[in-house]
Each structure stands twice: as C-alpha cells, then as structure tokens.
Amino acid sequence: MNEEDLNRLNASGDLNGANNQRIPAGPSGVNQPIPSVTAGGQNQFRPSGGLGNQGSRPTESSNQDELLPTEAEIEAITSDVESNSVAPKATIREILDTLQAKRQNATPKDLFSLAWACYHNGSSRFVNLNTDAPCGITHADLKTLWKASATLRQFCSYYAKSCYVSGKQQKKPPANWSRKGYPEEAKFAGFDFFNAVLSESSPAPPGGMRFKPTQAEILGHSMNAKMSIVESRQSSHMVSTRADLLGRQQINEQPKPPMITF
C-alpha cells in the first residue's frame, strides 16, 4: 500500500481495512500487538496494553541468606530486652522466693525497700546498711541472700525507675548527692544505678514514668561515673596513675625558650 492509497483509506473512514484488523488472541489468551501502517508502507507493532508477558520478578525469599533467621523468628527473639547490668525478672522472683522461705510475711515491698535504701547509700557490695525491711529482716542480711545469682547493683537496677520516680514525686533526692558533687539541677540522678532508668530492662513503676530524666541529670551522672572510675584506679594503681599524671604534666608543660648565643 502506497501513500496515496493510505490517504484514500483514511479519508473514507473505513476502519475495517485489512491493515486495521486486530489479530486474534494467541494460545495464551493475550491479545497480540496491532499492526499499524506508516507512510512508507512499513508495519510497526504497538503493544495492546496490560502487563502481557513481562518477566516475573524474583521473590524476596529466593534471595534470603540461608544463615539468617526468618522475619518471624527475628521478631520473636527481639521482643524481649535483657541487659546484663539489670537483674532479669526471673532472678528477682527467685530472690523473693528465697526471702519468703525465711520470712513468710515478705512481699515485693521488702525488695523495693532494699533498693530504696541503696538509692540513698549506694549499691556497692561494700555498702553498710543499718535499716530494716518491712518484714523485719535487716537490709544487711537481705542483700546477702542471693550472692550467686546477681550483684546488689544488678538487683537495684531492676527498681531504678521506681526509685527515680518516687524520689522526684516525693522531692527526696539521694541523700549523698551533694557529697558526690552533683549540681542542684542533677541531684535526682545522684544514685549509682541511675543509668538503669534509661534501660528497657528496668520495668516502669505501677503509676508509669511520670518523670523523665533531664539532659542535665544524664550528663551529671555520666561525669560522676567517669570520676568514680578515675578515683578507683587511683586507689588501686597508685604507681601507674602517678606515672600517667607525670606524663600528662610533661605534655602540658610549656617548651623552654631557645638559648640565644652571640
């Protein structure tokens, strides 16, 4: 078909010409491309629409590393958060069972009373506690019931949020905050297991987290913790610490002026 025949066909409006018929669907049921005639008499095929025979994309499962768990397994494992600085709930339950074996009237408030005493006096294993739990046992005896399962600080860290919120709510900062060098705006962070307040492993108190740690409290506790580490090293490694201080002094010492000769 030449250009003159094509123009005549378009002018007549005949849409049933041989070159305008749709090719029947193929075996797959997908309409075949429709041929269109150009001015030069050449056939050009245009797609009939739809996705047609596009190649199927590979599924994500085919690309999954065989050494990785499934998505459901990852969600199951990461649903619980445990930190080795905070005693897990199972350990706290064992401690309560041990206490109740000695004191039948013991309740969870006795365990919290020990954490509250350490809130004011420290949770070091060397701390001296002269107070008593509500059930009648002394805190000094209570803190020795579970030496093998958790440290005193790990135990107290479980109650860190409860101690922090109670202290702020009752306006009772740790008793030794000033002696430890905390500023006024950070005094409620002046207990040595404050960092557990920011841990997901420490449960929130029954009334929820009514108070959140401020930036000043977080910074104040961080600086105090670093100073405690320095003091601990000074007391146990006096020789090496003194050498470090001398080395720093030599580094910071101003250089001697050059000698001028004539």
Swiss-Prot record:
Keyword Ribonucleoprotein: yes
Any Pfam family the entry gives: Flexi_CP
Subcellular location(s) of the protein: Virion
GO molecular function ontology, one term from the record: structural molecule activity
Cross-referenced InterPro entries: Pltvir_coat
Major localization listed first in the record, in broad terms: virion
Keywords of the record: Capsid protein, Helical capsid protein, Ribonucleoprotein, Virion
Ranges where the record places region Disordered: 1-67
A cellular component annotation (GO) from this entry: helical viral capsid
Annotated TM spans: none
Polar residues composition bias: residue spans: 29-46, 54-65
Similarity comment: family membership: Belongs to the potexvirus capsid protein family.
Function as written in the Swiss-Prot or TrEMBL entry: Required for genome encapsidation. Forms ribonucleoprotein complexes along with TGB1 helicase and viral RNA.
Protein name: Capsid protein
Lineage, broadest ranks: Viruses, Riboviria, Orthornavirae, Kitrinoviricota, Alsuviricetes
